[in-house]
């Protein structure tokens, strides 16, 4: 049986056993009600090491980034977001595989997790991912704060040892991922039981579908900051080429006009090149090109028409199914009435 290890300074760290964790949680809640935690005491001592190893999937990072970006677009300013982490835990090895959003309510100056919303979302995810369990929670920001400690206490009522993941979407660093992972422990600070964060190390674990998605995202960015996509870069290059072509054509046209007006001497080599340039486009007016062009237009129109017909058939199929369902219900009702008369 696992037991809680008690140091000489009476600092206790919650173990994985349910009885020990329940006792620790009750002690933490009782102490928090009597003596609020000091604002400056958030991180554990530098020599404190984590008790678990984390394997993080890229899908979680993309979910958090999408959540924060969507909230920023909706509200017009960056806002701190919260969500739940789900995955698998085997002993001291934790694999964070997915995540979902959490609804929060602001009561006074404190943020409170909506437990009803969490329970509803957990049931929905359990129906699809029955082998995934609640691991912890995520938020956004640069460093943990006292408010994060309060959220950690709330999450501890759901999971005895929750993991906190903090992502900084505003970071410009390209050397490493702007995220941190923490677990919590209870220690005595100035004679008071205090919840502190302990940094955790992590490794990235990917599956085939995630590797394809991450590779697609990486290819769609033209620089490390991700400000321009490949499509935008391609369009910019085309725009520059068209502008340059337009400028050169205007120069050639102005030269020919000046030669006709007698302002410049005629250069036969330049005139021959201009003549050859003007006769490049009419070459495409040959009957073979026209035939292929119209054939391709007909093919495109036929494909569009087939798509419209397919959509119409699909709508008709749904309509017939609903009609048959309604007809069967009415027939059953008539048969039931016939039994009583």
UniProtKB/Swiss-Prot annotation:
The gene is CSN6. Component of the COP9 signalosome complex (CSN), a complex involved in various cellular and developmental processes. The CSN complex is an essential regulator of the ubiquitin (Ubl) conjugation pathway by mediating the deneddylation of the cullin subunits of the SCF-type E3 ligase complexes, leading to decrease the Ubl ligase activity of SCF. The CSN complex plays an essential role in oogenesis and embryogenesis and is required for proper photoreceptor R cell differentiation and promote lamina glial cell migration or axon targeting. Residues 1-43 are annotated as: Disordered. GO terms for molecular function: identical protein binding. PROSITE patterns: MPN. GO terms for biological process: female germ-line stem cell population maintenance; germ cell development; male germ-line cyst encapsulation; oogenesis; protein deneddylation; protein stabilization. Residues 54-188 form the MPN domain. Although strongly related to metalloprotease proteins, it lacks the JAMM motif that probably constitutes the catalytic center. Its function as protease is therefore unsure. This is COP9 signalosome complex subunit 6. Component of the CSN complex, probably composed of CSN1b, alien/CSN2, CSN3, CSN4, CSN5, CSN6, CSN7 and CSN8. Pfam families: JAB, MitMem_reg. It comes from Drosophila melanogaster. Keywords: Cytoplasm, Developmental protein, Differentiation, Nucleus, Oogenesis, Signalosome. InterPro entries: EIF3F/CSN6-like_C, JAMM/MPN+_dom, MPN, MPN_CSN6. Its main location: cytoplasm.
